[in-house]
Amino acid sequence: STQPNNFLIREMVTAQLQNTGQRIDDVVLIPFMKQSIEQHPKGKHLVVLHTKGSHYLYSERYPEEYAKFKPECMSADGQCTQAALINAFDNSVLYIDSMLVDLFDQLRNKKAIVFYSSDHGESLSENMHFHATPRARAPAEQFRVPFMVWMSDAYIKANPQNESAFEQLKKLQAQKAVVSHQSIYDTVLGCLGVQSAQEQALNPKNNLCSSQWQTSLTSSTNQYIYPD
């Protein structure tokens, strides 16, 4: 079936009785993912987690015990120093790291692959905060984002194709290859081994798990390179 079995939005999670008065952040997604897997133990299973990540106000993206970097920016009035703003942002990244570790731990004994990427970066310099600057003037911090592919040992060993894909990803990591969101569609399907009889449906040049992958960005700018 191409229809989702279920979906939840943040407001629905917040309204649940067991969450009354509780902080609702990205970590709350993990139990829902675990529950979904338990309810569908056999067959192919796709779970999409839409996180808040490190969106402003950064101090609202992590609990107090993750405030490792101080002083932290706690207000939205624009009066925070650059150092405090960066500290709050770093704390939010630290919390996301812990969420990803928890996510991976839930999947280590399964044949699983995880794709993670941010939709944009954030500017933290004076008078140039946040994102959505027009592309022609956007600083690198706004368009250079993390892109992660994680595979469990069971997934890698499931077949030679997965092993080859993993080696290709490690190769690109070692080369510090410049990748972009343009690769997400073909990479997700390609790493999963999806094939299509339609020639134009999948582009191996955009598939990070393929040896045919080619970068679409220069290393120093956000200028796209469109091959003929």
Annotate each language-model stretch with its function:
Residues 225-228:
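C-terminal, low-complexity/hydrophilic appendages and adjacent surface loops
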Residues 38-39, 103-116, 122, 151-156, ...:
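Catalytic cores of PAPS-dependent sulfotransferases
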Residues 1-74, 144, 180-181, 186-194, ...:
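Active-site-proximal alpha/beta segments of enzymes that process anionic O-linked groups
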Residues 31-35, 72-117, 143, 148-150, ...:
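A long, amphipathic alpha-helix that forms part
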Residues 45-51, 100, 112-121, 147-148, ...:
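Beta-strand elements within well-structured catalytic alpha/beta cores of enzymes
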Residues 8-17, 67, 128-134, 163-170:
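Short glycine/proline- and charge-enriched loop/turn segments
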Residues 83-96, 135-145, 156-188, 198-203:
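A short beta-strand-to-alpha-helix junction
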Residues 112, 117-161, 202, 217-220:
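Histidine-centered active-site microenvironments of extracellular/periplasmic hydrolases
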